[in-house]
Each structure stands twice: as structure tokens, then as C-alpha cells.
Amino acid sequence: MKIMRKNHPLLKIINHSFIDLPTPSNISSWWNFGSLLGACLIIQILTGLFLAMHYTSDTTTAFSSVAHICRDVNYGWLIRYLHANGASMFFICLSIHAGRGIYYGSYVLSETWNIGIILFLTTMATAFVGYVLPWGQMSFWGATVITNLLSAIPYIGSTLFEWIWGGFSVDKATLTRFFAFHFILPFIITAFVLVHLLFLHETGSNNPSGLNSNSDKIPFHPYYTIKDLLGVFLLLLALMILALFFPDVLGDPDNFTPANPLNTPAHIKPEWYFLFAYAILRSIPNKLGGVLALILSILILAAFPLLNVSKQHGLIFRPITQTIYWIFIANLLVLTWIGGQPVXYPFTMIGQIASITYFAIILILMPISNTIENNIIKL
């Protein structure tokens, strides 16, 4: 078997990626979230596949087909809630994974980092079209409001959003194509994940110290396979607690009402993991400006490798940038909170301050603190 896994064309790839892979001996639990994201993706694809067997993408039957899944299909309620809450777990792991990348300077591996940003955007698109499928009030109005933002694009905007809608309003054609997108995108994500791993294994993984670890590496199996399995079991435990005890805690009560184009909810908002970007969008009074800020709030992650002027790798020995990093995380949490609040004073003002702070930290404060720390080292 040993010879086979090293010589067989297919097993050789698996062996070099998950068994004999030389891995830094000091990587902490923060490095577990990559494998947890893989576990989340598998859970989402499997539960989604079973849901797709019973779901109908028609405006007249979509809402009742979801109710049918929960009431009449064997363990349909469990599959549905695992899928819905699995998306939340996915974004929690994704946020921590990206946060760890920023903290420990993993963005210097620019190909891996940029594929990660593409993965983040694709996952957001998948989650958005998936949120529309139950065809509840918030699904319908969320789809209407967010897709309407495309009309802000000069010249082609109105044509573009009518083309995406498949008509002059969000209707049957929109739901059908959103279901098609939601079905195909996870497989595109899987392909990008393989490219992400390919680039990662070209350079090797980063480590907490930020130093070169070539002199001290251990095989991935059994050390990190056991460590990752523990993480997966804890993830499953958290997901099962969420799905079995608090299944609707992260959902919106408006989505228990079938979609009604004649009745607008008091406060239209997306899922909780989009609220930070939604707050940035709302903080700019101009429609086109808001859309650009929304897109830049994600694409600005690509600026990290370009703005990095530090002579040290990661933030572990850099107290000034460390402080700014944790202010950045706190600011993100404030934006998430503001995104869920109604558009009224003082929430709009807090949102505008937090949005300016978000961009200022990345574009101004972090490069300045890097330069200050470089000068301190010279002293």
C-alpha cells in the first residue's frame, strides 16, 4: 500500500496533498479553519442535493415545497435546517480563515490569497441566490433590492438588471435562474478550492512565528489529520446544537410569510453575514457610490499584499499593528450590528463613521503603523 500511494497517478496527488505533505510543526488551531471550510462545503453540497430533490423553483409552489420538505419528507426538517445553519457556519469559518490570513500575513502568498478572494465572492453570490429560493417575504424583497442595485451602473444598468430578472420584476424567471445558479455555483467553488490548494502547496503553508519553517517540518498525516478531525467534530457539534435547538435564531421572521409584491416589509435586510457590506452600502447617500463601496469592501482585501511594507511577517511581534487589527475587527462587528438596524438617527451616523474607519484602517493606518515599526527596528 505504501508503494501504491507513492506511485499510483491518482493516489500520488492525494499522498502529496494530505499524507506526506511537509507541514510546519508549530501551526496552531487557527490553521484548522481551512479544513473546516472543506467540511462545510461537503455538508452544504450533500444537504443541498437532497433538498433539490424535493424543491420546486416555481413562484406558486416554492414556498409550499419548502413547507412540504419540513413536514412530509423523512428528516426533511433536519436537512433544511442543517443547510440553512450550515451556511452561517460556513461564513463564520470563512471570516476567521480570512482574519487569520490578515493577522499572520498569509496574504504574501498572493496567488493563494487572490483565489481566496474569488472564493469569498463566489460563496457570497451562492448564499445570496440561495436566500431567495424559499420565496418568503424577505427572500423576495432582498432579491428585488439587491439586484436593483445593478441599475446604478451607467448606460447598461437598467438593461442588465432586467436581463437578470428575466422580465420587468422579480418573478418566476428570476427564481428559476437563481435556483440554477445556486445548484451550479458550489461545484465551481469546489474547482476554485482545488486551485487554492494547488497554489498553497506550491509555496507551503505560513506559520504563527512568520519565520521560515523549512528546517522544522513534519508530515501532515497523522499529526494534522487528527487535529483537523477534532476540529470537524467540534464544528458538527456546534452545527447540530444550532440546527436542533435554535434552528431559526439566525433567520428572519418575515421569511415565514409567503412572498407578496404588494406588501413591503418594514425593514429589508440580507442574511447576517452580509450585514457589514450592507451597512457600508447604506452609509453612502448616492446609489452608484454605495454600490462601488459595497464591491470595494470585499475587493479591498486584494490590497493587503500591495500595501504591505513591513519588514516582519505577520503581526505576532508588532504591537502597534496588532492594536489596529483588533480595532478593525471591532469595527467590522459594529458594521454588522448597524446593517441590521433601521435607517434612522443615530444608526446612519454610526454606520458612516464605521464605514470610513473600515477603509481608513486598511488604506492608511496599517501602512503607517508598518512604517513606524520598521523605523523602531532600526533604532
From Swiss-Prot:
Any one of the GO BP annotations: mitochondrial electron transport, ubiquinol to cytochrome c
Binding site for a ubiquinone: 201
Cofactor requirements of the protein: heme b
Binding site for heme b b566: 97, 196
CDD domains attached to this UniProt entry: cytochrome_b_C (cd00290), Cytochrome_b_N (cd00284)
Record field: transmembrane: 33-53, 77-98, 113-133, 178-198, 226-246, 288-308, 320-340, 347-367
Keyword Glycoprotein set for record: no
Positions annotated to bind heme b b562: 83, 182
Principal place of residence: mitochondrion
Gene Ontology MF annotations: metal ion binding; ubiquinol-cytochrome-c reductase activity
Pfam families with a match to the protein in the record: Cytochrom_B_C, Cytochrome_B
Cofactor note (record): Binds 2 heme b groups non-covalently.
Subunit structure: The cytochrome bc1 complex contains 11 subunits: 3 respiratory subunits (MT-CYB, CYC1 and UQCRFS1), 2 core proteins (UQCRC1 and UQCRC2) and 6 low-molecular weight proteins (UQCRH/QCR6, UQCRB/QCR7, UQCRQ/QCR8, UQCR10/QCR9, UQCR11/QCR10 and a cleavage product of UQCRFS1). This cytochrome bc1 complex then forms a dimer.
Additional facts recorded: Heme 1 (or BL or b562) is low-potential and absorbs at about 562 nm, and heme 2 (or BH or b566) is high-potential and absorbs at about 566 nm.
Name of the protein described by the UniProt record: Cytochrome b
